[in-house]
């Protein structure tokens, strides 16, 4: 569906290309240059952004468009950091922002520099209109891909105080998500004792112990939460490390686990099931030593589909994009909604340009028209949610 844009197409494409060309890779966490670029873009448009250091090399940038205070604020949120480009070859180099056949390629083009740039442009479009009843806040945060330190800093700095709703511009292909699974990352470690590979009976093989432990972990029921619409718990075994060579009995083995928990299943329930798996494995292989190290935890969050922000998003998807859809409850990926919207609960919607299945892959891209349409969607959403100020 064609949309009459309220901004210059060339400027929008330039902004996104400039942003993708900055390698804000996390790890190691080097996104301050991206935050500084966004701050300059906001200053160029007449705003007074705040740049906040989160850690060396990491920073948030925020800006606020003041309303009259008659209504709660709306928070636009996105993250600056991107995952590493990986070892697989790219046809389009990851930090050159090449444009081909209506697509802009690069690491972060979908996840989520297109959503972030679209929110900045929408912020500017709204500012050029009349005064609104509530504040519009733009927030670009650090460290979403690892630990959510940037979003946590927004909360600790009280930027979410007085916010009535949050819009997170992750790549969803304009599907509207209203819930997010919790995230529980664990590292399991089995500790044995080393020996020469020709005399394995003189040692204890930590990899063999881990094999028995993983069999019990994989038997943990992947449960639904109280509302089946949010799906089941999922488990991914992400990494396994152990041993130094075929002629040495390994004395250490480490495995990383990624559990995603639907709303209503607390971390502690899962942890007890993991501890039970350890006990079962130990009963089969007496003397097994296991250490459990939680590494990352994010709570599950959900917004009622009847909430005003959800209904406005769905209405605008119909009007602007010709998409008739209901809200989708839970994406497969994690976002900063768990940090921003859990305590206290704040309604949120996750919606943005770009396809989620392209995130973290070689030759990631965004359709330029989708990116441009997102600007108009976000701008109109802000105008309708906040509403025009009451005349004096």
Language model regions located:
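Short helix-capping segments at alpha-helix termini
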Residues: 45, 128-132, 159-161, 280-287, ...
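Metal-dependent amide/peptide-bond hydrolase catalytic core
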Residues: 1-2, 7, 53, 178, ...
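Short acidic loop-to-helix transition motifs that present clustered carboxylates
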Residues: 55-60, 172-173, 333-334
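Fold-level recognition of mixed alpha/beta catalytic cores in primary-metabolism enzymes, strongest
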Residues: 101-104, 109-110, 114-219, 360-373
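Residue-level signal for inorganic ion chemistry
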Residues: 19, 23, 170, 210, ...
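Acidic/His- and Gly-rich active-site-bordering loop/insert found
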Residues: 2-107, 128-132, 345, 355
């Amino acid at each position: 569906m064609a949309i009459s844009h309220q901004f210059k197409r060339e400027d929008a494409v330039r902004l996104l290309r400039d942003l993708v060309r900055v390698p804000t890779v996390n790890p190691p966490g080097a996104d301050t240059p991206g935050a500084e670029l966004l701050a300059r873009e906001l200053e160029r448009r007449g705003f007074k952004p705040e740049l906040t250091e989160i850690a060396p090399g990491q920073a948030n940038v925020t800006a606020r468009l003041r309303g009259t205070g008659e209504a709660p604020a709306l928070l636009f949120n996105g993250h600056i950091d991107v995952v590493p480009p990986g070892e697989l070859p790219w046809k389009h180099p990851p930090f050159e922002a090449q444009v081909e056949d209506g697509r802009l390629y690069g690491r972060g083009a979908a996840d989520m520099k297109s959503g972030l740039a679209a929110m900045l442009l929408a912020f500017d479009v709204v500012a050029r209109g009349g005064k609104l009843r509530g504040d519009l806040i733009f927030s670009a945060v650090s460290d979403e891909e690892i630990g959510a330190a940037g979003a946590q800093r927004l909360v600790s700095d009280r930027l979410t105080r007085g916010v009535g709703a949050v819009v997170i511009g992750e790549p969803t292909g304009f599907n509207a998500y209203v819930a997010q699974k919790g995230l529980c990352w664990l590292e399991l470690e089995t500790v044995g004792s080393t020996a020469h590979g020709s005399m394995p009976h003189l040692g204890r093989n930590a990899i063999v112990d881990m094999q028995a432990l993983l069999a019990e972990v994989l038997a943990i029921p992947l449960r639904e939460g109280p509302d089946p619409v949010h799906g089941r718990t999922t488990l991914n075994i992400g990494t396994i490390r152990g041993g130094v060579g075929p002629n040495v009995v390994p004395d250490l083995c480490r495995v990383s686990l990624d559990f995603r928990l639907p709303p209503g299943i607390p971390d502690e329930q899962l942890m007890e099931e993991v501890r039970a798996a350890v006990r079962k494995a130990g009963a089969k292989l007496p003397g097994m030593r296991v250490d459990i190290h939680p590494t990352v935890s994010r709570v599950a969050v959900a917004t009622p589909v009847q909430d005003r922000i959800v209904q406005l998003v769905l209405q605008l998807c119909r009007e602007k994009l010709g998409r008739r859809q209901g809200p989708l409850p839970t994406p497969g990926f994690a976002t900063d909604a768990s940090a921003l919207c859990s305590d206290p609960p704040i309604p949120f919607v996750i919606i943005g340009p770009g396809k989620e299945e392209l995130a973290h892959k070689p030759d990631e891209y965004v359709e330029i028209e989708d990116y441009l349409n997102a600007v108009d969607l976000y701008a109109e959403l802000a105008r309708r949610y906040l509403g025009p100020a009451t005349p004096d």
